[in-house]
């Protein structure tokens, strides 16, 4: 098993990078979160990896952090979720966002990831419950039920997770759901 790869970054073509290790170029598929944090071409790079051997291919998947790799490994254990789908999930949302969606059982957030339908999202929520978060070193913020409901409502209305979370932070902690949604919508309308 190849656990880590270090070398010079030779090419960047999302989602694939080419890492030159002493004259040997390794093609590594990375989630977009890792891709955006890569150094410039020609600079030294080090990635944690997961090596997949199939009948027709040998593929290296690279990650910028141990939590990303651990989440990837949890995802590919799920029936019907292969490495490509797991990479898509990690490209569409951060590990923290995924852990939060699993904790709050928010299928709507996972469905927004390209290639993930309702059934797959529900299976992910079911299979990952209790497996993401503290197990892989992710801090999941525990909020009140009303805050969770407000966040879900804003996401359902089409706001991004980031915008909804920012609007939620500006609200008082003990606000009711309906008042919280109204205030958050006013804040987001500005």
Swiss-Prot record:
One GO-annotated biological process of the protein: DNA repair
Domain of life: Bacteria
GO molecular function list: ATP binding; four-way junction DNA binding; four-way junction helicase activity
SS bond partners: none
Region (Domain I): 1-64
Ranges where the record places region Domain II: 65-137
Region named Flexible linker: 137-141
UniProt subcellular location: Cytoplasm
InterPro entries recorded: DNA_helicase_Holl-junc_RuvA_I, Hlx-hairpin-Hlx_DNA-bd_motif, NA-bd_OB-fold, RuvA, RuvA_2-like, RuvA_C, RuvA_C_sf
Renumbered residue ranges of the record's region Domain III: 142-190
An example Gene Ontology CC term for this record: Holliday junction helicase complex
Signal peptide segment: none
Transmembrane regions: none
A Pfam family it matches: RuvA_C
CDD domains: UBA_RuvA_C (cd14332)
UniProt KW keywords: Cytoplasm, DNA damage, DNA recombination, DNA repair, DNA-binding
NCBIfam families, per the entry: ruvA
Subunit-structure text: Homotetramer. Forms an RuvA(8)-RuvB(12)-Holliday junction (HJ) complex. HJ DNA is sandwiched between 2 RuvA tetramers; dsDNA enters through RuvA and exits via RuvB. An RuvB hexamer assembles on each DNA strand where it exits the tetramer. Each RuvB hexamer is contacted by two RuvA subunits (via domain III) on 2 adjacent RuvB subunits; this complex drives branch migration. In the full resolvosome a probable DNA-RuvA(4)-RuvB(12)-RuvC(2) complex forms which resolves the HJ.
Function: The RuvA-RuvB-RuvC complex processes Holliday junction (HJ) DNA during genetic recombination and DNA repair, while the RuvA-RuvB complex plays an important role in the rescue of blocked DNA replication forks via replication fork reversal (RFR). RuvA specifically binds to HJ cruciform DNA, conferring on it an open structure. The RuvB hexamer acts as an ATP-dependent pump, pulling dsDNA into and through the RuvAB complex. HJ branch migration allows RuvC to scan DNA until it finds its consensus sequence, where it cleaves and resolves the cruciform DNA.
Free-text note on domains in this protein's UniProt record: Has three domains with a flexible linker between the domains II and III and assumes an 'L' shape. Domain III is highly mobile and contacts RuvB.
Family of this protein: Belongs to the RuvA family.
Protein name stated in the entry: Holliday junction branch migration complex subunit RuvA
Organism: Polaromonas sp. (strain JS666 / ATCC BAA-500)
């Amino acid at each position: 098993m190849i656990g880590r790869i270090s070398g010079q970054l030779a090419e960047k073509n999302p989602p694939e990078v080419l890492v030159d290790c002493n004259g040997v170029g390794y093609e590594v598929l990375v989630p977009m979160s890792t891709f955006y944090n890569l150094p410039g071409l020609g600079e030294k790079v080090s990635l944690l990896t997961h090596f997949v051997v199939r009948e027709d291919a040998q593929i290296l998947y690279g990650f910028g952090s141990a939590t990303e790799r651990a989440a990837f490994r949890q995802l590919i254990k799920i029936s019907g979720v292969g490495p490509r789908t797991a990479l898509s999930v990690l490209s569409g949302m951060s590990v923290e966002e995924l852990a939060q969606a699993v904790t709050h059982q928010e299928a709507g957030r996972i469905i927004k990831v390209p290639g993930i339908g309702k059934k797959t999202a529900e299976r992910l929520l079911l299979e990952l419950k209790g497996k993401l978060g503290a197990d892989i070193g992710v801090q999941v913020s525990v909020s009140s039920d009303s805050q969770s409901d407000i966040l879900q409502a804003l996401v359902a209305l089409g706001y991004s997770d980031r915008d909804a979370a920012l609007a939620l932070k500006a609200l008082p902690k003990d606000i009711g759901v309906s008042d919280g949604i109204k205030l958050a919508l006013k804040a987001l309308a500005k």
